[in-house]
Amino acid sequence: MAELMAMGNDVVHVAVKSDVRESRSTLLWALRNLGAKKVCILHVYQPKTASPAARKLEELEAIMYETLHDYFDFCQQEGVNEDDIYISCIEMNDVKQGILELIHESKIKKLVMGAASDHHYSEKMFDLKSRKAKYVYQHAPSSCEVMFMCDGHLIYTKEANLEDCMGETESEAGQSKPKLYSSASPKCSAELVSAIVAYIDTRRDRDMLEPNASEDQSESDRNDQLYRQLKQALMEVEESKREAYEECVRRFKAENTAVEAIRSAREYEAMYNEEAKLRKEGKEALAKQRKMVEKTKQERDDALIIILNGRKLYNEELRRRVEAEEMLGKEKEEHERTKKEIEEVRAIVQDGTLYNEQLRHRKEMEESMKRQEEELEKTKKEKEEACMISKNLMQLYEDEVRQRKEAEELVKRRREELEKVKKEKEEACSVGQNFMRLYEEEARRRKGTEEELSKVAAEKDAASSVCSEILLLLQSYTRRHGTPSGFSDEDSVTRQPPSYFICPISQEVMREPRVAADGFTYEAESLREWLDNGHETSPMTNLKLAHNNLVPNHALRSAIQEWLQRNS
């Protein structure tokens, strides 16, 4: 404890709960953001009994180790040395009072504690929610800087008063003997050894600074020997105490394990008894249910047998009754019919109207025969007329069938013609594509020809001069000797233009050649007239043009102009 008081601001105190999951974020923030060399974990142990008796130091240390060893391991995982981790614990029912007690005992200058549980955190949280945090904020010494955390975020900081810090430091320096031991610290033995060694070193340094110390060498040797003996004794005490502490911890763990095992065994025994009881009751209930099911099934079978037998008897009785009713109905009908016939015969015999009735029937039959003959003649005439109409209708039907066949043949021929036209169009498209390819090749050849023509131009000029001289000689010769047979001026002058100089529409030499969408070259004016007259197809391929854009053919135009100049 004295060592922690002596280090002052180098130690960060963090108040934690017994469960590491509840205070892990607070401890992690303190280790990563405050940059302290040493850390001290504060914990207030709340006993389970309302009024706990005084505990021994070893028992309290065992409880602290059992409760806070997870924090110790967590600090080591974050890179803190084992010698730089301290644990300060106090046993008290009131947690906030315990925290204040630890602050006063350890003279804490910097404390980190929770402002509320982590699940209460929100971005708009700026106030303290926990009653313990509010109490510590109100009653903590002004020399202690307290930082309140929630879910790894700093919520509020209580700043320390520097004047009060200086006053407390001076008052601590004026004290003759510091408090070297605290029953609440599990490392009290190590702190005691460190404090005693520091005290002896201080005394030794002070004696060495005195003027007479250098003269008495024997006194110094004795002090050194005493110092070594004392240090050896303290190390043995420390080792013994550590072994006692470890034994206490092991015993405490063993007792807890035994108690837990006994409790678990009792719980398992109770659960087994309860399960056995439920199983027995379930078996009994299942046996009763099976008996009831068997009984119900037997009753159902008996009832079904009775119902089936009764239904058979009912159906048999119903069938007999229906047959008897049918026989009775037939006998009644036969009796009524016989009675009526007897009465009719009796009436005819008594009145003497049987003969008269026969005569009347004969006359009626003769009249009906005459009417039937007349109707037969009339029907015969109607049938003859109907036959003529049917014959005409048959002829009309045959004509219609013949016309229908002709129409079908015409449609078939039309389809064949359409397919043929379609094929011709496809062939024309392929021909147009070939023409385009040939035109491109012709353009390339023409370009080469133009280059050759430019080279031959000089030769032509020389040839023309020679020709002119020859013509002069020929003219002079003809004037002297006459014109030779089979030789005229027209044959020497007349020259026909190439076929690709002629427009396919006007059949004249083109002046402004333009390339259309079908790949052929036309005279610009003639092709515009063709398009203005409503034509949308190519004059050469008779296919629809993709567009009406005309591209000037400069190479062909220059060739035509050169030809015209030579033949002008």
Curated annotation (Swiss-Prot):
One of its GO terms (molecular function) is ubiquitin-protein transferase activity. Pathway: Protein modification; protein ubiquitination. It holds the Pfam family U-box. Residues 217-464 form a coiled coil. Keywords: Coiled coil, Transferase, Ubl conjugation pathway. It catalyses: S-ubiquitinyl-[E2 ubiquitin-conjugating enzyme]-L-cysteine + [acceptor protein]-L-lysine = [E2 ubiquitin-conjugating enzyme]-L-cysteine + N(6)-ubiquitinyl-[acceptor protein]-L-lysine. InterPro entries: Rossmann-like_a/b/a_fold (IPR014729), U-box_ubiquitin_ligases (IPR051348), Ubox_domain (IPR003613), Znf_RING/FYVE/PHD (IPR013083). It comes from the Eukaryota. Its EC number is 2.3.2.27. GO terms for biological process: protein ubiquitination. It is an enzyme of class 2 (transferase). Residues 496-568 form the U-box domain. Functions as an E3 ubiquitin ligase. This is Putative U-box domain-containing protein 55. It comes from Arabidopsis thaliana.
